[in-house]
């Protein structure tokens, strides 16, 4: 091995350690902020075979070793009998990790193919079937929490999807009770950036399983929103971080949802609420400081985005 190769290896290791530290820190912070994991929890980690769920399991196993509390992890994969699904990959990988796991075999593929007309997206029905099976499995395993691998970009994409197409400000919750009311669902990667996860996954060399084995058409609306956010991230560095921060800094008095704020009872004796109304004056938006790639950068006000032109 040449000195140049050794130096490159050292540089790669340094970058890997830095990236792993950031993902660990972001995951740990999300877990703490939302009280996702408690002492004695048994976490069912849903493993699809994609970069996000592999990274989630990896980081949770790492945090488990140093956490001040005790919790169990059990990795679960649903083999939906899609054609070409490599059944040996996940068992071999999970055996090598020494983590408890369960492979659930359910032929949902045949059901979906029978029920959904050719050419139509199968994702909605497939998702409902998968969700029901995972809920049942969590109960069988005695899991106290169900961990999903959605990251910060997924959460933002869902917010914009709901605003653009659903007419509501609704994202993807870091922690919430499942729709059947029986399980607590957590998203430990809620603070993690997709681009970090992609880099980390490449460095780790996970045995990624393709997500399009079913041949379903992609969700074009989500693809469009994803592309929009990626474009914004390139044109306006730090914009994604600021938008996600906005989800944690909601001011109901300055929106229009009367179920969240009692507008009807306001009179001149109500006092100034959250800075009050400044009439015809345009609000001055103070530049925000964001952290990106561990380098702190201040926004340039000249880059402010005119959303009316999008």
Curated annotation (Swiss-Prot):
Cofactor binding mode and count: Binds 1 [4Fe-4S] cluster per subunit. The cluster is chelated by three Cys residues, the fourth Fe has a free coordination site that may bind a sulfur atom transferred from the persulfide of IscS.
Lineage, uppermost ranks: Bacteria, Pseudomonadati, Pseudomonadota, Gammaproteobacteria, Vibrionales
Species the sequence originates in: Vibrio cholerae serotype O1 (strain ATCC 39315 / El Tor Inaba N16961)
Protein transport found in the keyword field: no
Catalysis: reaction(s): cytidine(32) in tRNA + S-sulfanyl-L-cysteinyl-[cysteine desulfurase] + AH2 + ATP = 2-thiocytidine(32) in tRNA + L-cysteinyl-[cysteine desulfurase] + A + AMP + diphosphate + H(+)
Extra facts: The thiolation reaction likely consists of two steps: a first activation step by ATP to form an adenylated intermediate of the target base of tRNA, and a second nucleophilic substitution step of the sulfur (S) atom supplied by the hydrosulfide attached to the Fe-S cluster.
Biochemical pathway: tRNA modification
Enzyme Commission number, as recorded: 2.8.1.-
Family designation: Belongs to the TtcA family.
Enzyme kind, highest EC tier: transferase
Keywords of this entry: 4Fe-4S, ATP-binding, Cytoplasm, Iron, Iron-sulfur, Magnesium, Metal-binding, Nucleotide-binding, RNA-binding, Transferase, tRNA processing, tRNA-binding
Subunit note: Homodimer.
Localization terms from the record: Cytoplasm
SUPFAM superfamilies given in the database record: Adenine nucleotide alpha hydrolases-like (SSF52402)
Extent of motif PP-loop motif: 48-53
Residue positions binding [4Fe-4S] cluster: 123, 126, 214
Gene: ttcA
GO molecular function, one term: tRNA binding
Gene Ontology, cellular component aspect: cytosol
Main location: cytoplasm
Record-level GO BP terms: tRNA thio-modification
Keyword flag Nucleotide-binding: yes
Protein name: tRNA-cytidine(32) 2-sulfurtransferase
Superkingdom of the source species: Bacteria
Function comment: Catalyzes the ATP-dependent 2-thiolation of cytidine in position 32 of tRNA, to form 2-thiocytidine (s(2)C32). The sulfur atoms are provided by the cysteine/cysteine desulfurase (IscS) system.
Listed cofactors: Mg(2+); [4Fe-4S] cluster
